[in-house]
Amino acid sequence: MSLLEQLARKRIEKSKGLLSADQSHSTSKSASLLERLHKNRETKDNNAETKRKDLKTLLAKDKVKRSDFTPNQHSVSLSLKLSALKKSNSDLEKQGKSVTLDSKENELPTKRKSPDDKLNLEESWKAIKEMNHYCFLKNDPCINQTDDFAFTNFIIKDKKNSLSTSIPLSSQNSSFLSLKKHNNELLGIFVPCNLPKTTRKVAIENFNRPSPDDIIQSAQLNAFNEKLENLNIKSVPKAEKKEPINLQTPPTESIDIHSFIATHPLNLTCLFLGDTNAGKSTLLGHLLYDLNEISMSSMRELQKKSSNLDPSSSNSFKVILDNTKTERENGFSMFKKVIQVENDLLPPSSTLTLIDTPGSIKYFNKETLNSILTFDPEVYVLVIDCNYDSWEKSLDGPNNQIYEILKVISYLNKNSACKKHLIILLNKADLISWDKHRLEMIQSELNYVLKENFQWTDAEFQFIPCSGLLGSNLNKTENITKSKYKSEFDSINYVPEWYEGPTFFSQLYLLVEHNMNKIETTLEEPFVGTILQSSVLQPIAEINYVSLKVLINSGYIQSGQTIEIHTQYEDFHYYGIVSRMKNSKQILETNTKNNISVGLNPDILEVLVKIHNTEDFTKKQFHIRKGDIIIHSRKTNTLSPNLPNTLKLLALRLIKLSIQTHALSDPVDLGSELLLYHNLTHNAVKLVKILGTNDISINPNQSLIVEVEIIEPDFALNVIDSKYITNNIVLTSIDHKVIAVGRIACQ
């Protein structure tokens, strides 16, 4: 065969082979699609069956392995313990059956479930039932609930009773031991297995000890029991029934107030002012002697006492008022003195109140300014020392008290409804032999200051030269008859012929008569009193009484009425009943008179008050001070219909002041510390605000409204908001220079 034939044959065979392959391929595609689907399904089933068999086999093997050893506290996890308790018995049985059936069908060699596994499942169910049974019987007295193994012991005891007849002893003991160990794992103290044995033992011992909270509670209980043992319970005496406070006590005497006021003597208050050693006390003492207020025998006793003192600073008339040992030794007045005069030498139905004030700069502000504000006198008596160089020193010295006094009294005169009167006594005229030229020079200088600087008119002031030691020009000798015999204390009434003016007493007499035309006290005025002096008496039959010296600033008071005493350092106030009242005098001799039933403005009375024994009042804590305020009980108005009930009492720490400044050497800035004088009190305050302006300082000669705050923390200023009370104040610097005078703006 040729080469071409062979090649052709190969091509034919090749084409036949390709055709048969295509046919077979197409037939296989059409025929094997279903077959391939069946094959794939069988393959997947086989794979899933194999995987399922493998998983079941692994689970079965794992169960067999877990049943080969006894679980302990450290190998069994908490999740396995909880899962064993949560699964139901039926689920476990079904799972077991499904596992055995699948293993038989697949003919895989697996181990059968051991009887120990079945026993463990049954014991788990029994344990759950026993736990429920224990919870139901937990109140059984045979169970010690404080024991950590109470539950396990209960189960063991119950098992012994239930299985003693049916289970052999060996299996019973092993079952109980395994159950106890299982319960210990659930309810015992967990300690990591990797710890040493000694550490585990110490940890368990620590948990068995009391906790820190238990230790604290035990200590508290022991302390309480100890105090309870030491407690001595005594029978508490019954509290005494306190007398209820009657706020509607009527007066002890029924008096027609209208007729009493109409016949009551009218008073003129005269306040003596001046520099130290100006002779105020000597002059006033001699005047009291001339007014028959001091007897001859008393004067001789005083003369003996004054003979032992320095004659340059003391005399018989001076020691009448300087009646304390300190004042007599120092030779100058230190305290104010108040004298009330009521005798036949005065006009009918009139009284005279004389007030002596200290002139020393150390006591000037404390006593003098408070006296001016408290007593609000109708007459100011300015005593001037006319001796050579004395007048000039008083003007040129660093503390020009005369000018400071004129600042205060001039403002009060300008803003008072009733104009004041000023008497200027040119004292010690005998030491200059009544030098007319010198007396006129002093008078001219003061006249200019009063008119130009302080706007006094000629009718409001009067100059009177005199001698307080000799009594010259104090009073005419023929008007007073003390004795038919002459005395060494009688006035030497030497007055030069060129003087044609009045004597001091004659001028007072005219002012007393003029004062009788003033408006009388009305029933609308509320009763307000200022305590000048306080003393606590010994309790009488367990009833507390206090004796008070009271200045009546407004209205009237009757014996038997209930009053309120308001202190300035405490938040509470006292209630009391006025037991009795009598006129007060602060000189050596006092005429003993019967008690009075009514006190009027401006009387100074000694008042005995019965204090209600409230909780705030004790014998050791009784605080009534000078400057405290007495008012009518504001709840009384039924039994005494005439009593006013419109009084408003304010306790202020932040105070608004309407002031008039004077000539100042330096402006007073905000935040500066000042002294505020009001009635008998003076307190340090801080300048807080200047109202109505953007200024940050107080300048001279300004009318301002300012706010000040009291620095002392426990003090509140008692202020009466009434048109009958003036509430005048004085502001001074720390070195006692008068800065401004004004009044408290209550509104």
Swiss-Prot record:
GO terms for biological process: nonfunctional rRNA decay; nuclear-transcribed mRNA catabolic process; nuclear-transcribed mRNA catabolic process, 3'-5' exonucleolytic nonsense-mediated decay; nuclear-transcribed mRNA catabolic process, non-stop decay; protein catabolic process; regulation of translation; translation. Residues 427-430 are annotated as: G4. Residues 35-51 have a biased composition (Basic and acidic residues). Keywords: Cytoplasm, GTP-binding, Nonsense-mediated mRNA decay, Nucleotide-binding, Phosphoprotein, Protein biosynthesis, Repressor, Translation regulation. It comes from the Eukaryota. Residues 356-359 are annotated as: G3. Belongs to the TRAFAC class translation factor GTPase superfamily. Classic translation factor GTPase family. Present with 233 molecules/cell in log phase SD medium. This is Superkiller protein 7. It comes from Saccharomyces cerevisiae (strain ATCC 204508 / S288c) (Baker's yeast). The lineage of its organism: Eukaryota, Fungi, Dikarya, Ascomycota, Saccharomycotina. The gene is SKI7.
